[in-house]
Regions:
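Surface-exposed beta-strand edges and their flanking turn/coil or helix-capping segments
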Residues: 1, 25-27, 80, 90-92, ...
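Active-site C-terminal subdomain of aminotransferase-like
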Residues: 1-74, 78-80
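Alpha-helical scaffolding segments of alpha/beta enzyme cores, especially the outer helices
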Residues: 7, 49, 53-56, 87, ...
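A common structural junction motif
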Residues: 19-21, 93-100, 127-130
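Short amphipathic beta-strand starts and helix->beta connectors
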Residues: 58-64, 91-98
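Conserved PLP cofactor-binding pocket of PLP-dependent enzymes
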Residues: 69-70, 74, 96-111
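A C-terminal functional module that forms or caps the active site or interfaces directly
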Residues: 76-93, 100
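PLP-dependent enzyme catalytic core of the Aspartate aminotransferase-like
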Residues: 83, 87, 105-130
Length: 130
């Protein structure tokens, strides 16, 4: 149970939704997470390392204002105000790279089981370009 003022409760609701807490099918996601831990634990470490590598490249990019600390396979970042978000996303989409818009200027990239080493190298190369 969480108790707090309006600001805290609104923040908690936003985070819950961001993490999938508003989904009715949350049991399916929990089952997938359990399977991943049982069968792909070592692979999860690779995903986490790749996410950290993506974050490191983003931190060096002039287009990126900030990158949140990476603890899992999720990379969350904000663009500089002079970079049109739609143009940035469209450019990556043209290279078959999908980035989620989280709102409030935050963007999200996620590594996963089907994200290959070749895809990773390609992404890092594209993100490294000015």
């Amino acid at each position: 149970m969480l108790v707090g003022d309006d600001a805290l409760m609104n923040k908690a609701l936003r985070i819950r939704k961001m993490l999938g807490g508003g989904m009715r099918q949350i049991g399916s996601l929990a089952a997938a997470a359990s399977y991943a831990l049982d069968h792909h634990y070592d692979r999860l470490k690779e995903d986490h390392q790749k996410a950290k590598e993506i974050a490191a490249v983003l931190q060096q990019s002039e287009a990126v204002l900030s990158v949140e600390p990476v603890e899992t396979n999720i990379v969350i970042f904000k663009l500089n105000s002079n970079i049109p978000e739609a143009l940035f996303l469209d450019n990556l989409k043209a290279h078959n790279i999908l980035v989620s818009d989280m709102g409030s200027g935050k963007l999200r990239m996620v590594t996963h089981l089907d994200y290959t080493d070749a895809m990773h190298a390609n992404l890092l190369e594209i993100l490294s370009k000015p």
